[in-house]
Amino acid sequence: MGERFDKYEYLQDLMRRRGFAWGSFEIYGGSRGFYDYGPLGATIKRKIEKKIREAFIREGFFEIETPDITPEQVFIASGHVEKFVDPIVECKKCGARFRADHLIEETLGIDVEGKSAEEMTKIIREHNIKCPECGGELGDVFYFNLMFETYIGPYKDKKAYLRPETAQGIFVNFKRLNAFARNKLPFGVFQIGKAYRNEISPRQGMIRLREFTQAEVEIFFNPNETEHPHFDEVKHEKLRLYPIENQLKDLGMIELTAEEAVKKGYLMNTFFAYYLVMIKKILLDIGIPEDKIRFRQQLPEERAHYSADTWDAEVYSERFGWVECVGLAYRTDYDLSRHMKMSGADLTVMIHYDKPKIVKRLKVSLNMKSVGPKLKKDAKRINEKIQAMSEEELRELVKKLNEEGKIVIDGYELSKDDFIIKEVEEKVTGEKIIPHVLEPSFGIDRPFYLLLENSLTIDEDGRIYLKIKKDMAPIEVAVLPLVAKEPLTKIAYDLFRKLQKEGFIVVYDEKDSIGKRYMRYDEIGTPYCVTIDNQTPIDGTVTIRDRDTREQIRVKLEDVPRKLKELIFGS
């Protein structure tokens, strides 16, 4: 059985048969990239979300909720309208469309990440790659935006999109969130919700979906203060890293403590390292084995348009290899700067100094005597525009005047003599900055699948069961009368009701032999079966059977809730 056993196929059957998850819209033939969660799957999914939510709250992050549908302006500002695209190629004969980079990789075994549409078209022509569906000729590669487009109301001019990430809902609310945080950096805001990506040809089951759940945190911080105050608590935690250099030289992974990773320059600072450790701890708490987790640094051509550095927490799958489950992206001030520019809103934070500082500032204004006749009524407006410039913009203006002797503002050519330029000293108590952002971004659906895959276990005697982390089991306890006869059934049902009231996810089952029932609950990962047998009416004890060892202990009826809490939750 071991050699022929296909874990993926068995798991797909198990998920459908026992109520974990299955492809959506089955009765209409299904639709790729969409999955429904059944009763058991939805329970595990909620438990994953709960673990992540509780970890975020322990870090002091705030939770919000924002709409899935987002006006187009938001995604123009964020760069998604322009940049959130994948290369696509269409068959000239049958019209089937494929993701071009994936098709080339699957056909030739070469990585074309970062190559242009023209370069991929050339590769397809040179290697005579044909349509996988019909063998027809493929057209030129072009780009396809992955956002689902819609409209707000009955008006075609109010274009909107289903959000491809939850993050933008946080960024556009920054002013209110900063006020809630009392203008004090750093602070973190998260939300857990749906995101949508119109994948070209989603395959691999739950690994690549068009609708999926995310848990994203945006941590706003001062880029000049990147030492995490609690780093000492995690500095000895080990991380398995796969940095860019090792990927390019095929050197494999390295294992370092968080402190070593920072000192050796693999991780940019303790702030970044702290949250990488947080991600690892959450995955472990969900039940992902530590030896199946690594952190891979994305190559520059892989990174999203907003990222200066990204490390992915990847989990190993027997079917799919290393699968990205969580990303930690350094988004710099990209998003807030873009939204400031597009909306005109002030998304800065005032940073107060411990002591006032004397700083040199440029004071630039128009020489009204010189420009008055030239600019006439526009002189006042252009002067106000110059006064509103940042220090950086003023220095750039002066630099250009010094180098070229002139500058054009609103169509007017102005010389150096048209300006009054002074450098003055000022006492300042603080400065306005645009916060930078570090983003831990969790998928929920991939960890769900990988938790099940890594939990699926075959004993030496051929027993197949889910060795899922006990507090992650979709059914925590099964109460089983040995036979369906009084008084065993009444005692069993009363215990079942008691456990329900104590908050356990518990079932009562009296159908089939006790052996079949044990197998039934082993298969779905139920950690403990409580059996009411013929000894129970005599001495008031029951057996608690362990899923993994199949060992049984006898416990008094009144002690069952306490004992189960201890066994399942460690309390």
Swiss-Prot record:
Positions contributing to substrate binding: 99, 165, 212-216, 439-443
Classification via CDD domains: GlyRS-like_core (cd00774), GlyRS_anticodon (cd00858)
UniProt GO BP: glycyl-tRNA aminoacylation
A GO MF term: ATP binding
GO cellular component: cytoplasm
Reactions mediated catalytically: tRNA(Gly) + glycine + ATP = glycyl-tRNA(Gly) + AMP + diphosphate
Gene3D superfamilies: 3.30.720.200, Anticodon-binding domain, Bira Bifunctional Protein, Domain 2
Enzyme class: ligase
Compartments in which it is found: Cytoplasm
EC code(s) of this entry: 6.1.1.14
Keyword ATP-binding: yes
PANTHER family: GLYCINE--TRNA LIGASE, GLYCYL-TRNA SYNTHETASE/DNA POLYMERASE SUBUNIT GAMMA-2
Family label: Belongs to the class-II aminoacyl-tRNA synthetase family.
Function per UniProt: Catalyzes the attachment of glycine to tRNA(Gly).
NCBIfam families assigned to the protein according to its UniProt record, in alphabetical order: glyS_dimeric (TIGR00389), PRK04173.1 (NF003211)
Name this protein carries in UniProt: Glycine--tRNA ligase
Organism whose genome encodes this protein: Pyrococcus abyssi (strain GE5 / Orsay)
